[in-house]
Amino acid sequence: MWGLAKFGFYFWGVTTYVVDLTLCTGPSMEPTLNANSDLVLLDRVSPRLGRIATGDIVVADSPTRPGETVCKRVSAVAGERVPGSFFADVVPPGCVWLLGDNRRNSTDSRVYGPVPTDIVKGRVVLRVWPLDQARVFI
């Protein structure tokens, strides 16, 4: 019994603080990710260390729908100019600007604005499934 509890504790610690598997669903990241639930490996350390960079694909808590997550690409980090902005909009400290790769079918920072980095759950480093489309993203 103690062995099972110990395993559970370690598993919880690893998936909470180091790496985790999650599903990315929806058309907003096509063609990079499939709309039909790609299973991806998340690096959960990078956001905690402030190592999220422009171009990274991240999973974050949804800014508009509690209990849901979004999978988007970081298009600007704090201090960088918002891409495509007609004004001199700059991402504020502690935030990132998230966009879907499929701009025509994505609800992203163009709708909900800058996203606080503390709701970024992890950086996508690997598509695990479908197996024939496995891909490294770092």
Where are these regions (language model features)?
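Protein maturation boundaries and topogenic segments
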Residues: 1-69, 89-91, 117-119, 123-138
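Short beta-strand-centered aromatic/proline hotspots
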Residues: 70-76
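Short, conserved beta-turn/loop elements at beta-strand boundaries and strand-helix junctions
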Residues: 78-84, 127-129
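Acidic loop->beta-strand submotif enriched in PP2C/PPM serine/threonine phosphatases
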Residues: 83-93
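Phosphate/adenylate-binding glycine loop and adjacent helical scaffold
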Residues: 100
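Segments surrounding the PLD/"HKD" phosphodiesterase catalytic module and close analogs
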Residues: 109-119
